UniProtKB/Swiss-Prot annotation:
Transmembrane segments: none annotated. The gene is env. The keyword Glycoprotein applies. Pfam families: Baculo_F (PF12259). This is Retrovirus-related Env polyprotein from copia-like transposable element 17.6. Keywords: Glycoprotein, Transposable element. It comes from the Eukaryota.
Length: 456
């Protein structure tokens, strides 16, 4: 019985004439690969061993600290500026004046005193200059270590980058081998061998297997890539009581189809369950059945479909005819509605029954990714240099401050202990003044006018 109305609203009621203990219900079709392209990815195990030995040798000889090139160049420029300034300020005695007089014996007493003072100053400056040279030598040694540090850093950065790429390649191959045991394809293998017929739609349908060629010491990962697909109808198995009240003991919700005398589920996996395969092939099922303990049944098959079993005459309310006319139904029925709603024994059936009535907002923040950039070796070095700039500037500033402080203390003849001594001396004087004031408060003042007793 089919009742249709305008605007696509429809209610369909059909009799169920079966006595098997189950129903076969048509489900949506699935897309199944019909032809494949076979591809082989060859991995030379001998070459991998050679590369592994190369990295082992590099790690033994080239393991050094990270680079500090920026700090080294900065220190070179600052040191050149400091040496130039001190060389201009620290000249010897006047060659045209005092030395000329001394050589020819024309100096007088004033000249002698002036020359002696300059010679003493020059001797003192020579001592200071020797100490400065020691400091400069120490700095030069440190900068030489920094330069060696930088050279070794370039080597280790290159080594780490190459080792990272090689390790990632080995991990991808290993994952491909593990997934091939399950017949699955590792998408990361596409990084090493681009395949024309592989896309996001069929990548889950790619099957793989792993082989080893002992003669050439090669590992072969063979991919079966689907290039053509076909639509195949599927069916669901629905337990439904027979006339004696027994139904199939079955709880699965998968859909099945038959191809080349084999049964597969909707994920294209072969089914070996004899009960399921016989039902799909319309053979005599070898299954377990169970007794039901109810007089009648009303249950959902899909959001817009229900079935009834042994139903007594019942009134069905519906709005599929733009009115709420009741329909009397009885027995074993399958009821399906389209763009309308029915109600039977307080059970509401609608095509939109299971659609949410509230707005579900995701709890995560969507990521606006417009482009993914591949990071290259040069980019990695640049990022490392940029991240180290702050550290380099800080270290350079500290070293310059220490050098300036050293020069200031040496050549300005500033004694940092004088201020400490002055503070201690001032505090001692304040303590003495306080003690004298306390003693004065304890001594009683003299009486200028002695008291005279009163006479009566």
């Amino acid at each position: 019985m089919l009742i249709t109305t305008v605007h696509g609203q429809q209610i369909e009621i059909n009799n169920i004439d079966t006595n098997h203990g189950y129903l076969l219900f048509s489900d949506k079709p699935v897309q199944i690969p019909s032809s494949f392209e076979h591809h082989c990815l060859r991995i030379n195990l001998t070459e991998i061993d050679t590369i592994a030995d190369y990295f082992e040798q590099r790690l033994r000889t080239d393991y050094h600290a990270p680079q500090v090139k920026f700090l080294y160049n900065k220190m070179r420029r600052e040191l050149a500026g400091i040496a130039l300034r001190h060389r201009n300020k620290r000249g010897l005695i006047n060659i045209v004046g005092s030395v000329f007089k001394y050589l020819f014996g024309t100096l007088d007493e004033n000249d002698r005193v002036d020359i002696q003072r300059k010679l003493e100053t020059n001797a003192h400056n020579s001592v200071n200059l020797h100490e400065l040279n020691d400091a400069i030598q120490l700095i030069n040694d440190g900068m030489q270590k920094i330069q060696n540090y930088e050279n070794n850093s370039n080597i280790i950065n290159s080594l780490l980058y190459e080792l990272m790429q090689f390790t990632e390649y080995i991990e991808d191959v290993e994952m491909g081998m593990q997934l091939s045991r399950l017949g699955l394809f590792n998408p990361k293998l596409l990084n090493y061998d681009k395949l024309e017929n592989v896309n996001s739609q069929n990548i889950l349908n790619i099957k793989t297997s792993t082989w080893i060629n002992y003669n050439d010491n090669q590992l072969l990962i063979i991919s079966h890539i689907p290039i053509n697909f076909s639509l195949i109808n599927t069916v669901k198995i629905i337990p439904y009581p027979d006339s004696n009240g027994y139904q199939l003991e079955y709880t699965d919700t998968q859909s099945y189809f038959e191809r080349e005398n084999k049964v597969y589920n909707n994920e294209n996996k072969e089914i070996n369950n004899e009960c399921v395969t016989n039902i799909i092939k319309h053979l005599k099922p070898i299954c377990n059945f169970e007794s039901i303990h109810t007089d009648e049944i009303i249950k959902y098959i899909e959001p817009n479909t229900i079935v009834t079993w042994n139903l007594t005459q019942t009134s069905l309310k519906q709005n599929c005819q733009n009115s709420f006319n009741n329909i009397k139904i009885k027995g074993n029925k399958m009821i399906k509605v389209t763009q309308c709603k029915i109600e039977i024994n307080s059970i509401i059936l609608s095509e939109n029954l299971f659609k949410p009535e509230i707005d579900l907002t995701p709890l995560y923040t969507p990521l606006n990714i417009t482009k993914i950039k591949t990071v290259k070796h040069n980019d990695i070095n640049e990022m490392i240099s940029q991240n180290n700039i702050t550290l380099y500037i800080f270290m350079t500033t500290v070293i310059i401050i220490l050098i300036l402080l050293y020069l200031y203390l040496r050549y300005v003849s500033f004694n940092p202990f004088m201020m400490l001594y002055a503070k201690l001396k001032l505090r001692k004087n304040q303590n003495q003044n306080t003690a004298q004031q306390i003693e004065m408060e304890d001594v009683p003042l003299p009486l200028l006018y002695p008291s005279i007793p009163a006479q009566v």
